[in-house]
């Protein structure tokens, strides 16, 4: 009995055929793509974020919505309800007493959902890291996609984190997460 050690090329012919079809139709105004790519493209331009402001980082988070930075030009708009939002921005010190509320709000968000951890306190406890009542990073309660460092981070840093999240969504998939 012999074992085949050749690499698996299943689907390679289909990929080559799709690329050839794309080249042929490109000049005619058509585009061949998958529905998942279209969904990822649309989702990156229409993220709805929900604030979970717990401390001074929340003030900088508010600045991103003001006219100077205008986060809506990047396709991200604030929402008041977790059921209408795709992104949760955790900004500030997360205490042990507040952790169950954070998890409950996260569970109410529809899939796919993303979390941005903003500031040193949300990232790892910050100044209050050794306090008995502080969670040493919100990633112990909810899965975090993007970390924004700083104490408090600037509005520009948060905007950069939002752009990184959009890039991550485009690069990975939103359907199977």
Curated annotation (Swiss-Prot):
Q: Which reaction does it catalyse?
A: a quinone + NADH + 5 H(+)(in) = a quinol + NAD(+) + 4 H(+)(out)
A Gene Ontology biological process in which this protein takes part is: electron transport coupled proton transport
EC number(s) from the headed UniProt entry: 7.1.1.-
Q: Which Gene3D superfamilies match?
A: 3.40.50.12280
One Pfam family this sequence matches? Oxidored_q6
What does the UniProt cofactor note say? Binds 1 [4Fe-4S] cluster.
What are the alphabetically sorted keywords of the record? 4Fe-4S, Cell inner membrane, Cell membrane, Iron, Iron-sulfur, Membrane, Metal-binding, NAD, Quinone, Translocase, Transport, Ubiquinone
Membrane topology value: Peripheral membrane protein
GO MF term list? 4 iron, 4 sulfur cluster binding; iron ion binding; NADH dehydrogenase (ubiquinone) activity; NADH:ubiquinone reductase (non-electrogenic) activity; quinone binding
Signal peptide segment: none
Q: Report if keyword DNA damage is assigned.
A: no
The question of whether Cell inner membrane is a record keyword is answered with yes
- Give compartment(s): Cell inner membrane
What residues bind [4Fe-4S] cluster, as annotated? 56-57, 121, 151
Superkingdom of the source species = Bacteria
Q: Which is one Gene Ontology cellular component term of this protein?
A: plasma membrane
Q: Which cofactor does it need?
A: [4Fe-4S] cluster
NCBIfam families xrefs: nuoB_fam, PRK06411.1
- Reported function: NDH-1 shuttles electrons from NADH, via FMN and iron-sulfur (Fe-S) centers, to quinones in the respiratory chain. Couples the redox reaction to proton translocation (for every two electrons transferred, four hydrogen ions are translocated across the cytoplasmic membrane), and thus conserves the redox energy in a proton gradient.
Instruction: Describe its partners and assembly state.
Output: NDH-1 is composed of 14 different subunits. Subunits NuoB, C, D, E, F, and G constitute the peripheral sector of the complex.
What the entry lists under HAMAP family is as follows: NDH1_NuoB
Family, similarity comment = Belongs to the complex I 20 kDa subunit family.
Q: What is the official name of this protein in its record? A: NADH-quinone oxidoreductase subunit B
């Amino acid at each position: 009995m012999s074992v085949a050690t050749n690499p698996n090329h299943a689907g390679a012919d289909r990929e080559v055929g799709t690329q050839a079809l794309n080249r042929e139709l490109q000049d005619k105004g058509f585009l061949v793509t998958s529905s998942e790519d279209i969904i990822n493209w649309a989702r990156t331009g229409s993220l709805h974020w929900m604030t979970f402001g717990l401390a001074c980082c929340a003030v900088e988070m508010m600045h991103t919505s003001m006219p100077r930075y205008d986060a809506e030009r990047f396709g991200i708009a604030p929402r008041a309800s977790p059921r209408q939002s795709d992104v949760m921005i955790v900004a500030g010190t997360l205490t042990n007493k507040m952790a169950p509320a954070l998890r409950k709000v996260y569970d109410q968000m529809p899939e796919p959902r993303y979390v941005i951890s903003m500031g040193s306190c949300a990232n790892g406890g910050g100044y209050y890291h050794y306090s008995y009542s502080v969670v040493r990073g919100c990633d112990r309660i909810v899965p975090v996609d993007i970390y924004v460092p700083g104490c408090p981070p600037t509005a520009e840093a948060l905007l950069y984190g939002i752009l990184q999240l959009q890039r991550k969504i485009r690069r990975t998939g939103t359907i199977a997460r």
